[in-house]
Amino acid sequence: MTDETKLTYADAGVDIDAGNAMVEAIKPLVRATRRRGADAEIGGFGGLFDLKAAGFTDPILVAANDGVGTKVRIAIETGAHDTIGIDLVAMCVNDLIVQGAEPLFFLDYYASGKLDGAAAAAVVKGIANGCIEAGAALIGGETAEMPGLYAGADYDLAGFAVGAVERGALLPRSDIAAGDVLLGLASSGAHSNGFSLIRKIVAAQKLGWDAPAPYAPGQSLGAALLTPTRIYVKTLLPLLRAQAGIKGLAHITGGGFPDNLPRVLPQGLGVEVDLSAIAVPPVFAWLAEAGHVSAAEMLRTFNCGVGMALICAEADAGALLASLRAAGEQPVALGRVTPAGAERVTYSGRLSL
């Protein structure tokens, strides 16, 4: 083989220079996420975090990882890449806060068939914005260019978050009991779950992402569906630190109430949810009608308007509701903890679909 015919990595579809240029471009975004314990510099073999500098005394580390499911397909097809990274952070850090943990640092994985530096940088910008909102340092990541595994401009994301909680403050507490109150915090929409069903409904309706959103005047359907997942850390962390009476938290993701509420309940206990208390966002009413989706299927697929659930003693509910309102939330009294029956999650009232 002559010098003229020798192959290079670039000939195989991997552009090392493009990857290095992207890393340089995102360094200012990453630095903006620095916090106590991390300088948020990237480029080394691993990210560093000084747990002592973060102020913990007897901490337990909590780790979570997640993705954004097929919501990423909408970002790819619309070319709107700047908020999907917020979703990625939210899905991970919300799983930390429900265990009482303060998010400390975050790492991401971005995989594509051919690296689009501008798209990747926009994704990382969203990740950095999510990290800032969650108070987590973005201390590292991996950008993988893998020709033959992803078609065209397709990419996928994974996130990894680590937090810490003092040993005595771990959630859920062991004293959750029948009669405790269930509170709900509003979601911003579908968050990052159920998008395979959403995309199927959109296709059946023969709608494009640039079509007007049937449920959101003034927005395109793609933009409305890309509304980022809420990050609940800034609301909940001060209340946890203040020992405001939160006994348990549940992040309402895939599986809805039936799958997620039992994860924080002791054996022998269930919960009754008052569906009429939920202010259901218009997106869910549209999905239910357009897709002929039953209320039961909606409840086991989507958050239906409640992205985070809290459990507290009845005596603490009034003060906790007031604190949540002072933090800018619109909490609802969602139900009560009950002795478990045949189904651990039961319902009263009806969803406003």
UniProtKB/Swiss-Prot annotation:
The EC number(s) this enzyme carries: 6.3.3.1
Any one of the GO BP annotations: 'de novo' IMP biosynthetic process
Keywords: ATP-binding, Cytoplasm, Ligase, Nucleotide-binding, Purine biosynthesis
Keyword Nucleotide-binding: yes
Compartments where found: Cytoplasm
GO MF term list: ATP binding; phosphoribosylamine-glycine ligase activity; phosphoribosylformylglycinamidine cyclo-ligase activity
Database matches in InterPro entries: PurM-like_C_dom, PurM-like_C_sf, PurM-like_N, PurM-like_N_sf, PurM_cligase
Major enzyme class: ligase
Pathway: Purine metabolism; IMP biosynthesis via de novo pathway; 5-amino-1-(5-phospho-D-ribosyl)imidazole from N(2)-formyl-N(1)-(5-phospho-D-ribosyl)glycinamide: step 2/2
Any single Pfam family the record assigns to this protein: AIRS_C
Reactions the enzyme catalyzes: 2-formamido-N(1)-(5-O-phospho-beta-D-ribosyl)acetamidine + ATP = 5-amino-1-(5-phospho-beta-D-ribosyl)imidazole + ADP + phosphate + H(+)
GO CC, alphabetical: cytosol
SUPFAM superfamilies, per the entry: PurM C-terminal domain-like, PurM N-terminal domain-like
Family annotation (NCBIfam families): purM
Family: Belongs to the AIR synthase family.
Stated name of the protein: Phosphoribosylformylglycinamidine cyclo-ligase
Organism whose genome encodes this protein: Methylocella silvestris (strain DSM 15510 / CIP 108128 / LMG 27833 / NCIMB 13906 / BL2)
Upper lineage: Bacteria, Pseudomonadati, Pseudomonadota, Alphaproteobacteria, Hyphomicrobiales
Gene from which this protein is expressed: purM
